[in-house]
A protein has these predicted regions:
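Class I S-adenosyl-L-methionine
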Residues: 1-22, 27-121, 223-224, 228
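A contiguous loop/helix-start segment that scaffolds small-molecule binding in enzyme catalytic cores
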Residues: 2-3, 9-12, 85-90, 146, ...
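Class I SAM-dependent methyltransferase SAM-binding "motif I" and its flanking Rossmann-like core
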Residues: 2-3, 97-170, 213-216, 284
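Short, acidic/turn-prone active-site loops that include or flank metal/cofactor-
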Residues: 19, 44-46, 62-69, 124-126, ...
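Conserved active-site and cofactor/substrate-binding residues in soluble primary-metabolism enzymes
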Residues: 24, 28, 34, 44, ...
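Short beta-strand/turn micro-motifs composed of small residues
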Residues: 41, 94, 122, 151, ...
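Hydrophobic packing residues within well-ordered alpha-helices of enzyme cores
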Residues: 49-50, 111, 130-131, 186, ...
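Short hydrophobic/aromatic-enriched beta-strand-loop microsegments
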Residues: 57-64, 115-119, 138-148, 194-203
Length: 284
């Protein structure tokens, strides 16, 4: 049996809360959450996860959502270090996996610089949950040999700068985190770098949650599709030939959760798309 690791006084754990569904927490994450005396949590960590905290634990919201920041990163670093130095059992609870676009390095460095013991508990990342939700594999033997994760988040006032030539790989699946607002930029740059316009795309919002929405489209229709198909929840783009293998029946079922009026707006969008492309449907 591996050694049981608990949250000790004066220690920090960076814990992955997974994509949202509390049942996708690891057993270790659930136990660490229950042992903490203070939990600093992201905006995307839902109530179903926070309910697992000890009744006497302090819950401190330090989340960041689409430019609406409750705390800057430097302040978060100071808060978790101060709590640990005060002898608290600290859990820094992050959506998904802490080491994937989770600003883990800054918090690890801050703890180590202060002499605070710090450890990581991994979590299920959003791309895995999104793929499961649409019944697809992100890799496919002989077709999709690589998997690339990128974030479409750029600092305020700065352009999104990625190596589009490398990302436009027909033998790879591309997962774009925080990709909804940048869908047009992503599609235009990938096509300019040579990726085919009919490359399949899945837009997945609120992956793993009851309000999950799924929309299948293609790269050349992605910008219009993203404006119509999604709400205001966190969304991820999955791009690549492996998406042709998605379970479309399951996706159709999930699309029924679209908010009232979305279907009619999607139809209107497809009419506009048809005027430009001659195609009436964005589905694969």
């Amino acid at each position: 049996m591996p050694e049981r690791n608990s949250v000790r006084d004066g220690e920090v754990w960076l814990v992955g809360a997974g994509p949202g569904d509390p049942e996708l927490l690891t057993r270790k994450a659930e136990r660490l959450i229950g042992e903490a005396s203070v939990i600093f949590h992201d905006a995307l960590v839902g109530p179903g996860v926070l309910e697992l905290a000890h009744p006497g634990a302090r819950l401190v919201h330090v989340g960041k959502r689409s430019g609406r920041h409750s705390k800057d990163q430097g302040t978060i670093d100071k808060l978790i270090v101060a709590a640990a130095l005060a002898g608290e059992r600290v859990v820094r609870l992050k959506g998904g996996d802490p080491s994937i676009f989770g600003r883990a390095t800054e918090e690890l460095d801050a703890c180590r610089a202060a002499g605070v013991p710090v450890r990581i508990c991994p979590g299920v990342t959003a791309a895995s949950a999104a793929a499961a939700g649409i019944g697809a594999s992100l890799t496919l033997r002989g077709l999709a040999r690589k998997l690339t994760f990128v974030t479409a988040h750029a600092r305020a006032g700065e352009a999104l700068e990625l190596d589009w030539d490398k990302l436009a790989d027909p033998e790879a699946t591309l997962a774009v985190y925080m990709g909804k607002a940048a869908a047009g930029v992503v599609s235009r740059n990938l096509m300019a770098a040579g990726l085919a316009g009919d490359t399949p795309v899945a837009l997945v919002e609120n992956a793993s949650l009851p309000q999950e929405r799924v929309f299948f489209t293609r790269l050349d229709l992605l910008e219009l599709s993203s404006r119509t198909a999604l709400g205001d929840g966190p969304a991820l783009l999955l791009i690549g030939e492996a998406l042709r293998q998605a379970d479309l029946r399951q996706a159709d079922l999930q699309q029924r959760t679209m908010r009232p009026g979305a279907a009619s707006r999607a139809a209107e969008t497809m009419e506009r798309v048809a005027c430009h492309t001659g195609r009436r449907t964005p589905t694969i």
